[in-house]
């Protein structure tokens, strides 16, 4: 077994423990946008959530997340590493971009059903989860993941300095920026997945209907991405160095 597959899964568990509360806030924020409800900033929301429902309520939806994160990050890091070693492409930037595109698409196949379960758990009681549309939002998730993975594959491999803190900052910064860029696709993904029925609105119809609302939850998602990739890449690179 390629060690990158094992270490990729372990890095995913570590990153999720840090980032899940922010991810929970992002989904609840986007849900309030869809429903026309008042929206709260992240810190007041979390304080109120803890006071009302306890600290562990910030980890609602964590079980499907943690169950899925091992194969998801195994794919994310493992496929990148395998592609980087085996793709016969001389230009390194092109090779890392292609590796990221492949890893992102493969990750989406594994991730989407768990994302549907996680998002519906955050918005409804577990008894109301509807999994017949387990691949709702797949195309939007695939676009988002492929672009995101390409950016991280580039930043993690093209930047070859040994300074772990600087590499942490490069990966976290790349994740933050690309999370902002791909936010409209994340909005579409969540819009499809948060509904029990199959949602039919096209991307361009959504742009006309929601306009700047498509960037709701942008910074909470960007913070989540920065934590995930900063911490995840740090753990993965550290383990791979042995």
Please tell me what each predicted stretch does.
Residues 1-242:
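Matrix-facing interhelical linker segments
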């Amino acid at each position: 077994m390629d060690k990158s597959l094992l270490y990729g899964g372990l890095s995913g568990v570590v990153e999720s423990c840090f980032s899940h509360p922010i991810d929970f806030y992002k989904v609840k924020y986007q849900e309030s946008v869809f429903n026309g409800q008042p929206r709260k900033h992240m810190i007041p929301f979390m304080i109120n959530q803890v006071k009302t429902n306890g600290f562990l309520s910030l980890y609602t939806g964590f079980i499907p997340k943690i169950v899925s994160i091992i194969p998801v990050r195994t794919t994310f890091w493992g496929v990148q590493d395998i592609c980087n070693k085996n793709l016969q492409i001389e230009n390194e930037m092109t090779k890392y971009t292609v590796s990221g595109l492949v890893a992102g698409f493969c990750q989406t196949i594994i991730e989407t059903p768990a994302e549907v379960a996680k998002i519906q758990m955050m918005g409804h009681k577990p008894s109301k989860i509807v999994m017949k549309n387990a691949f709702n939002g797949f195309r939007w998730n695939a676009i988002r993941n492929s672009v995101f993975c390409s950016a991280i594959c580039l930043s993690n491999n093209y930047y070859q300095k040994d300074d772990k803190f600087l590499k942490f900052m490069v990966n976290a910064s790349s994740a933050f920026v690309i999370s902002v860029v791909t936010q409209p696709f994340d909005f579409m993904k969540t819009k499809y997945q948060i509904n029990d029925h199959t949602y039919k609105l096209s991307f361009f119809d959504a742009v006309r209907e929601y306009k700047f609302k498509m960037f709701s939850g942008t910074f909470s998602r960007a913070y989540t991405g920065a934590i995930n990739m900063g911490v995840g890449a740090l753990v993965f690179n550290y383990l791979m160095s042995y």
